[in-house]
Curated annotation (Swiss-Prot):
InterPro entries associated with the record: 3-IsopropMal_deHydase_ssu, Aconitase/3IPM_dehydase_swvl, AconitaseA/IPMdHydase_ssu_swvl, IPMI_Swivel, LeuD
Entry keyword annotation includes Cytoplasm: no
A Pfam family hit: Aconitase_C
Pathway(s) of this molecule: Amino-acid biosynthesis; L-leucine biosynthesis; L-leucine from 3-methyl-2-oxobutanoate: step 2/4
Family statement: Belongs to the LeuD family. LeuD type 1 subfamily.
Subunit structure, interactors included: Heterodimer of LeuC and LeuD.
Gene designation per UniProt: leuD
UniProt protein name: 3-isopropylmalate dehydratase small subunit
């Protein structure tokens, strides 16, 4: 995974609550075994009309949202079935951060395990960010080290994250990488405690 320390990026807002994983990445696109290539299917049923052409009314299809790396949405983002493909699709599309008042627990943890930073902010703060996200030039800075989200206009809010998950993101590690860090300790433990022939 890529280390996450500070990220500055354009925001895009989807002003909807209860966006479920079936909307994030529809089931017909889950047959792939790679972790890449899912971005083209992100929000497929909303992004495309029935004839396959882009839906000009959908937020992410608007020109002002092109290149956005921070997604702002309403509460209970990522509810529904547990599919790790949802964070993969968001990342593959280009998002590094998702901001919402609340997330479904499994989705939240899947994001952290895959290097996508989900940030919970108060509903009023999210409403403000959704309004600001309508501007083509609006950017946010996210400092994981300081656990803070801020813009150039005076908005600044702290956010909470589990210290263990924070360290993994800062280093760009997943749980397998962490195991390799302790490989010598694990081998020493096995030598001391495993039965010998």
């Amino acid at each position: 995974m890529k280390p996450f320390t500070i990220h500055r990026g354009k925001t895009a807002g989807i002003d909807r609550a209860n966006i479920d994983t079936d909307q994030i990445i529809p089931k017909q696109f889950l047959k792939r075994i790679e972790r890449t290539g899912f971005g083209q299917f992100l929000f497929y049923d909303w992004r495309y009309l029935s004839d396959g052409t882009p839906n000009p009314e959908f937020e992410l299809n608007r020109p002002e949202n092109e290149g956005a790396t921070i997604l702002v949405a309403d509460e209970n983002f990522g509810c529904g079935s547990s599919r790790e493909h949802a964070p993969w699709a968001l990342q593959d599309y280009g998002f590094r951060v998702i901001i919402a008042p609340s997330f479904a627990d499994i989705f939240y943890n899947n994001c952290l395990k895959n290097g996508l930073l989900p940030i919970r902010l108060d509903k009023e703060d999210v409403r403000y960010l959704l309004r600001q996200s309508e501007r083509a030039d609006y950017e946010l800075t996210v400092s994981l080290e300081e656990q803070r989200v801020f813009d150039d206009e005076g908005f600044s809010r702290p956010f909470d994250i589990d210290p263990y998950r924070k360290q993994l993101l800062l280093k760009g590690w997943d749980e397998i990488d962490l195991t390799f860090v302790y490989e010598a300790h694990i081998a020493a433990y096995e030598r001391r405690h495993c039965p010998r022939p």
